[in-house]
């Protein structure tokens, strides 16, 4: 992971350590948004990974999506499926 990606991962790790135990396990997606963010930063670096993580976190609300949504490149079988 690049140094900038490591810096961007710090708030996610802090959330997982400090807030997640109190908030509970109510993520709409699988993998959870925090796991997705760390995986996106690891696979795609700070810029693209940060964009993917931000987009995912912003879509996590009652009117957003839900279900299985892995980071692009993490599940080639899922990546090949047509969207829609």
Curated annotation (Swiss-Prot):
Subcellular location: Cell inner membrane
Ranges of Basic and acidic residues composition bias in the record: 75-84
Organism listed in the record: Cereibacter sphaeroides (strain ATCC 17023 / DSM 158 / JCM 6121 / CCUG 31486 / LMG 2827 / NBRC 12203 / NCIMB 8253 / ATH 2.4.1.) (Rhodobacter sphaeroides)
PANTHER family recorded: MEMBRANE PROTEIN INSERTION EFFICIENCY FACTOR-RELATED (PTHR33383:SF1)
UniProt-listed InterPro entries: Membr_insert_effic_factor_YidD
Recorded family membership: Belongs to the UPF0161 family.
Main location: membrane
Primary role: Could be involved in insertion of integral membrane proteins into the membrane.
Domain of life from the UniProt record: Bacteria
Name this polypeptide is given: Putative membrane protein insertion efficiency factor
Region span, Disordered: 63-84
One GO cellular component term noted in the UniProt record for this chain: plasma membrane
Membrane topology: Peripheral membrane protein
UniProt keyword annotation of Hydrolase present: no
Keywords noted in UniProt: Cell inner membrane, Cell membrane, Membrane
Source organism phylogeny: Bacteria, Pseudomonadati, Pseudomonadota, Alphaproteobacteria, Rhodobacterales
Record's keyword annotation contains Cell inner membrane: yes
